[in-house]
Regions:
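Acidic/glycine-rich phosphate/pyrophosphate-binding loops and surrounding catalytic core
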Residues: 131, 135-136, 142-144
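Nudix hydrolase/Nudix homology domain
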Residues: 3-5, 17-18, 22-25, 90, ...
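Active-site-adjacent beta-strand/loop module that shapes the phosphate/pyrophosphate-binding cleft
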Residues: 45-50, 144-163
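Conserved Nudix-box catalytic region and its N-terminal flanking loop in Nudix hydrolases
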Residues: 62, 67-69, 76-122, 168-171
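Conserved hydrophobic/aromatic beta-strand scaffold that supports enzyme active sites
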Residues: 41-43, 69, 79, 154-156, ...
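Intrinsically disordered, low-complexity terminal tails and inter-domain linkers enriched
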Residues: 4-21, 104-111
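Acidic, metal-coordinating catalytic segment for phosphate/diphosphate chemistry
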Residues: 31-67, 73, 82
Length: 208
């Protein structure tokens, strides 16, 4: 008599998918409160799995973006400092920026006009003037799964070299700084490195 071995991982996944059917909310109405070149900000009503209705629920769409953990040939990490309106403070963070789209808008179903790696190379060059031939994709993840539908893609760039000058967008006002690994660790511990996705990027990139 032959026995078929069951893959426990597959079984658990199937059980999870079945259970998830009882967790999903159904969006039953949507109002676009703000819809301009920068954001699609919505007010929605959702139906719980048990039939109750919850409203309002606010969410938004913006374009996907990239974060680059970049280091130079001396092993120092290339960062930028700029003002962040949400917390109304100047923060230290890694070079980052949006993936370009064919229609130039921040949201919608229009296809991106560049791959994420192309976007990362462009953003690093535009913000810092540095370029690299050593790139590694670390992770693509929702930037804020609770209220947004865009994704952040994290890259590691090593042995970066100065290849040109900054070419900043009209909305960018920033300065370039270099830090050692220990200095970045200290800034994170002391709450001076305040972009959550950038802290995650650092943890992914350590030792790589």
């Amino acid at each position: 008599m032959s026995c078929r071995k069951t893959n426990k991982t597959d079984t658990n996944k199937a059980d999870t998918n079945k259970a998830d059917e009882n967790l999903a909310w159904e969006e039953i109405s949507t109002e676009h409160i703000v819809q301009d070149r920068w954001i699609d900000f919505r007010k929605s009503a959702y139906r719980y799995p048990d039939g109750r209705v919850f409203e309002p629920f606010y969410s938004y769409s913006r374009r996907d973006y990239v974060v680059i953990v970049a280091s130079d040939t001396d092993g120092n990490y290339i960062c930028v400092r700029q003002f962040r309106q949400g917390i109304k403070e100047v923060t230290t963070e890694f070079p980052a920026g949006g993936v370009e789209r064919d229609d130039g808008r921040e949201y919608g179903t229009t296809k991106a006009s560049e791959e994420t790696l192309e976007a990362a190379k462009r953003e690093l060059m535009e913000e810092t003037g540095y370029a690299s031939d050593e790139w590694e994709h670390l992770l693509t993840i929702p930037s804020n799964a609770t209220i947004a539908d865009n994704y952040a893609t994290v890259f590691r760039a090593k042995n970066c070299r100065l290849a040109g000058e900054q070419n900043l967008d009209e909305t960018e006002v920033l300065q370039i700084y270099k830090y050692t690994e220990d200095e970045i660790e200290t800034m994170i511990r002391e709450g001076e490195f305040q972009q959550a996705v950038h802290v995650m990027a650092w943890l992914l990139a350590k030792g790589r």
